[in-house]
Amino acid sequence: MDVGAFALPLLALLGYSLTRLPQPTAQDIEQKSSRVTLNGKQRKELFIDFMPFLVLLFVANLMLVVLRDIKEDFLVKIIDMNGQSSWMFAQVDTVVTLIILALFGAMVFVKSNIKVLVALLGLVVLGTATMSFISFNYNSLQLDAITWLFVQSLCLYIAYLCFQSIFFDRFIACFKIKGNVGFFIVTIDFIGYTGTVLVLMFKEFAHADINWLEFYNILSGYVGLICTVAFTCSMIYLIQRYKKEKQLKKAKEAEMSNGIKFTGEGMEPTTFSQI
């Protein structure tokens, strides 16, 4: 209740601040593209257009949500916190949150959308790879409970929160998509909460005697490994797609300056005299 009483005025202040934001300037629209609501047909076309990329992100996010829910719901069974204050969990999460806020906040100073997207995916890949490494090597590393919890939380939440905050905003701006982040956030949340339901069902109906630390390390190790591959492939796709669209844009600019009609097929133009 104390936390809620402290957070409520801040939430109200932030909500009021959002209503006072100025309208986007022409430069803002040029850098980030205009944001409009998509209908069903447009959402389908957008998904098909970026399907390989989005499928990788959605599937990886599902696994991250399942791992996050297991960590939060079964944490007291996973690690031994005897002798530690009950505030230790909150302190670890606070430090993790501040680090992530600093990392994501620093992206404001980077104007290039593709650089931000690559940097974010790079952070995510680093996080999932580190999570997998410390999970598979838990016995040899011999980390204490607090260090293990801190590293696991930092790696997991960097990957999870990236797609709940700034990633899709920069994605829309980078590829000049006529839409908004609502479609992406709602879709990724829907898929993620499907994983949450599975975890809750497991919690209610599974009564097996499980070594939770061993189970979690195995699960986080494989989730980290799969997500590392998925996000690396996503980053490669993103870079290649951006280069391709940049080439198409240059060809269209050449069309305008040279009086040539761009066909978009094979990068071969057709002159107006041939029409």
Please provide the spans of the model-predicted regions.
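A membrane-interface helix-boundary motif in multi-pass transporters
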Residues: M1-F6, M201-V229
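Conserved extracellular-gate-facing transmembrane-helix segments in secondary transporters
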Residues: M63-K71
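Short amphipathic helix-loop junctions that connect adjacent transmembrane helices
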Residues: I70-W87
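Intracellular juxtamembrane helix-capping segments at the cytosolic ends
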Residues: L75, A159-F175
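Transmembrane alpha-helices of Major Facilitator/SLC transporters
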Residues: S85-N113, G127
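C-terminal transmembrane helical hairpin of 12-TM major facilitator-type secondary transporters
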Residues: K115-L161
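A late C-terminal transmembrane helix in Major Facilitator Superfamily
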Residues: C174-H207
